[in-house]
Design a protein with these regions (language model features):
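Glycine-rich anion-binding loop/nest that anchors nucleotide
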Residues: 71-77, 127-192, 207-214
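SIR2/sirtuin-family catalytic core signature
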Residues: 163-260
Length: 260
């Protein structure tokens, strides 16, 4: 508690503002320690799950996706679970909140982001070290995921009417953006807002497919999307089928909504 630290650290001789600064610094040190302990704990669980128990994937809606292992992955977790279960490639994965890495050397930082939401446009200097955006900057988790939204092309042949001729034409490939196992918590609103903006700017057909466990989870996701995007925007996107919802174990439902 503050009172015990107040006497233990000898802050009683300091001015009030200085003592509060010292307390804040102590909180930051404790947060760093908590993140280190969380990394050790998650590394242990990761080892148990995949090295000891040998957990394998069960049947899900993701089974409808061909070449799933070649997908680009925006990972909100600290562990590389998608690689273990679906064979995705690390070079095509962005750990937006950092990742566990017990093998890193002492001169490399812990990249795990573990903070609170930044709800205000104005920067509150007292809360900055605890906020996710600040930690993402300091820990350099980057914006690699934005590359996932760049246009990709395929060649199609257009037939010239009235002739037997056709000529090649570069067309933009559609993108299916599948959100699996995420509550769409507004804590990550800036990432979702950026993803929607990039998809709209891309000029290609796109669809955000949100998977849900049950009806309660679906309602929660819709509520969170309304907070992140605004009610009118969400209504617009669902009306144009740019946003759809599929139960997480519904392979047939996923097949129906995937853009070709």
């Amino acid at each position: 508690t503050f009172l015990s630290l107040f006497y233990e650290k000898g802050w009683s001789s300091l001015e009030r503002e200085v003592a509060l600064d010292e307390l804040n610094n102590e909180f930051i040190r404790q947060l760093d320690l908590l993140i280190e302990l969380l990394e050790i704990y998650l590394s242990y669980l990761d080892y148990l799950d995949f090295e000891v128990r040998g957990i394998e994937t069960s049947s899900t809606a993701l089974d409808a996706i061909s070449h799933l292992s070649n997908s680009s992955v925006l990972n909100f977790n600290y562990t590389n679970t998608s690689s273990h279960l679906f064979g995705t490639f690390e070079e095509k994965t962005h750990f937006i909140h950092g990742r566990i890495d017990l093998d890193r050397t002492f001169n490399r930082i812990n990249t795990m982001v573990f903070g609170i939401e930044d709800k205000e446009n104005d920067v509150n200097s007292d809360l900055v070290p605890y906020q996710k955006y600040y930690q993402r900057v300091v820990k350099e988790t980057g914006i690699k995921f934005e590359m996932f939204f760049l246009s990709s092309y395929f060649v199609e042949y257009l037939h010239v009417q009235g002739t037997e001729k056709s000529f090649p034409h570069d067309s933009k490939a559609a993108k299916n953006i599948i959100i699996f196992g995420h509550s769409v918590d507004p804590l990550d609103k800036e990432i979702f807002q950026k993803s929607f903006a990039l998809a709209e700017e891309g000029g290609y057909p796109y669809r955000f497919i949100f998977t849900y466990f049950d009806e309660s989870a679906k309602r929660s996701i819709i509520k969170n999307l309304a907070i992140i995007l605004g009610k009118e925007k969400l209504i617009e996107l669902t009306g144009t089928q740019n946003v759809v919802f599929v139960k997480s174990d519904d392979k047939i439902g996923m097949e129906k909504v995937l853009l070709p």
